[in-house]
């Protein structure tokens, strides 16, 4: 069972439809107990970083998401949800994030239209299980004005938009997609299926303990 975090700032329905499409069990929730009972977590997000962190704090979900990280449970952040996984953001004001990944969220300062919106090529920068069946140079769908300034060792896929944009990051059980896999056609569905596989493997490992 995958828990989709519902905190009022996520692209919940499109993520829900994607999980239905790949045939996985899910629950949409902001309940701490249900989140901790799940086998994997998806944190979507649309909006501003400070407001999102404020809502997560109000709902007492910051500590829950940090506990998910410490338990080794697979956690996937999408778009703003990915950005929230980092140490802090410069959006509107300096604001602390979940600190599950090293790095800072910075504003795109490029001679192109902002937000970065539409399809862009995603180049692999390392091998990871979520790449299974995904070709290097596949096109994925972005909508964002900020990007992650983070260590290269956690970047597994990147796009160019006047600056290197980390499109997919990972460290241990923590995964993040700056693009929207749920809006990226069959490539996105493949990556979500691979995340489902990671979740199922984690569940099996817990049952064998």
From Swiss-Prot:
Main location: cytoplasm
Organism: Bacillus mycoides (strain KBAB4) (Bacillus weihenstephanensis)
Protein name: Imidazole glycerol phosphate synthase subunit HisH
Documented EC number(s): 4.3.2.10, 3.5.1.2
Reactions listed under catalytic activity: 5-[(5-phospho-1-deoxy-D-ribulos-1-ylimino)methylamino]-1-(5-phospho-beta-D-ribosyl)imidazole-4-carboxamide + L-glutamine = D-erythro-1-(imidazol-4-yl)glycerol 3-phosphate + 5-amino-1-(5-phospho-beta-D-ribosyl)imidazole-4-carboxamide + L-glutamate + H(+); L-glutamine + H2O = L-glutamate + NH4(+)
Keyword Protein biosynthesis annotated: no
Pathway: Amino-acid biosynthesis; L-histidine biosynthesis; L-histidine from 5-phospho-alpha-D-ribose 1-diphosphate: step 5/9
HAMAP family, per the entry: HisH
Assigned keywords, A-Z: Amino-acid biosynthesis, Cytoplasm, Glutamine amidotransferase, Histidine biosynthesis, Hydrolase, Lyase
Function summary: IGPS catalyzes the conversion of PRFAR and glutamine to IGP, AICAR and glutamate. The HisH subunit catalyzes the hydrolysis of glutamine to glutamate and ammonia as part of the synthesis of IGP and AICAR. The resulting ammonia molecule is channeled to the active site of HisF.
Domain Glutamine amidotransferase type-1, chain residue ranges per copy: 1-205
């Amino acid at each position: 069972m995958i828990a989709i975090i519902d905190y009022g700032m996520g692209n919940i329905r499109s993520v829900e439809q994607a999980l239905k499409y790949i045939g996985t069990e899910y629950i949409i929730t902001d309940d701490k107990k249900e989140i901790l009972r799940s086998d994997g977590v998806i944190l979507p997000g649309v909006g501003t970083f400070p407001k999102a962190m404020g809502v997560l704090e109000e709902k007492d979900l910051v500590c829950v998401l940090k506990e998910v990280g410490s338990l080794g449970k697979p956690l996937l952040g999408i778009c703003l949800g990915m950005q929230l996984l980092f140490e802090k953001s410069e959006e509107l004001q300096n604001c602390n994030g979940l600190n599950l990944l090293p790095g800072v969220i910075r504003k795109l300062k490029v001679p192109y239209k902002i937000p970065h919106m539409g399809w862009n090529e995603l180049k692999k920068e390392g091998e990871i299980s979520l790449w299974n069946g995904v070709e290097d140079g596949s096109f994925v769908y972005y909508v964002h004005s900020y990007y992650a300034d983070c260590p290269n060792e956690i970047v597994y896929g990147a796009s160019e938009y006047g600056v290197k944009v980390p499109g997919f990051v990972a460290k241990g059980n923590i995964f993040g997609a700056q693009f929207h896999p749920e809006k990226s056609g069959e490539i996105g569905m493949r990556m979500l299926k691979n995340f489902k596989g990671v979740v199922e493997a984690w569940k099996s490992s817990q049952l064998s303990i």
